[in-house]
Amino acid sequence: MFSLFYGLWKYLFSKMELHVLILGIDKAGKTTLLEKMKSVYSNIEGIPPDRIIPTVGLNIGRIEVANSKLVFWDLGGQPGLRSIWEKYYEEAHAVIFVVDASCPSRFEDAKSALEKVLRHEDLQGAPLLILANKQDIPEAVSADELARYLDLKKLDERVSMFEAVSAYDGMGIRESAEWLVEVMERS
């Protein structure tokens, strides 16, 4: 009898745990984004941006948004580390792809990496949030400009959104996370 009530209690009151990959080429601001999300959704200050070093392997972060627990897997974006990304695809409920919107010379590399991610069968149907990061830098292109440049044909059948954010000052972070939770809870 206890297990029946426990199961019912757990069903009614526990939060759904969702796994989100944070991907992008090196220096896009993935770890800064993760640290800013942690500080926005908790009372704990994340690592200051000037103390963040390039990710070699994986950083894990956890936050609670609405009725969900989000577990973020922030993976290193250097060319030699991108081969490990696919080891995390099968368990991912969504993907955040971060692009440094202030550095157009790296858009082609970002587009190539993103297209490879989108082709993988384990991520078919996973919601995709593409972030035009570093909006605090005057030279950054808008989310619409980035979307036109990336010109991703495969997005037609996928739930996706482009959003302009600044992982440095937090602009757009809360809206992005709330959109992601909403679409993951529906799928």
Model-derived segments and spans:
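TRAFAC-class small GTPase G-domain
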Residues: 1-187
